[in-house]
């Protein structure tokens, strides 16, 4: 169960934010094989000054169209799967809603399975 956070500036429409969430989810299904119904996302728009980023970090020019994607998921994916996931997210967001590849910043956070609770305060994956 990946938990996805997407953060954008207010200039993006609610429809664009939904399309971004759809593109990230599609990439998770295709690249690392999560079940299609396994969708948990927090999609947020922020006022100017509330989403802070370096417009030229590592020589990559970013605009106000920047999209932050943070995916928290269980450990266990190979480096190849992670690279495929990153590429699929960028490809999907470029297709719809037309996000520039330079504006997609992705952070993968891996946690051990016993750190998840899916309800009732129980660590369902703990053995």
Model-derived regions: residue spans:
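Interaction-mediating elements
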Residues: 1-127
């Amino acid at each position: 169960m990946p938990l996805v956070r997407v953060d954008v500036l207010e200039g993006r429409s609610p429809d664009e934010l939904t399309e971004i969430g759809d593109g990230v989810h599609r990439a998770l299904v295709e690249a690392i094989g999560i079940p299609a119904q396994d969708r948990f996302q927090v999609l947020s728009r922020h006022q100017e000054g509330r989403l802070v980023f370096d417009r030229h970090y590592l020589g990559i020019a970013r605009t106000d169209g920047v999209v932050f994607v943070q995916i928290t998921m269980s450990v266990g994916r190979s480096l190849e799967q992670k690279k495929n996931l990153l590429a699929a997210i960028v490809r999907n967001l470029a297709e719809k809603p037309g996000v520039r590849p330079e504006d997609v910043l992705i952070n993968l956070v891996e946690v051990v399975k016993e750190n998840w609770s899916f309800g009732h305060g129980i660590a369902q994956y703990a053995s």
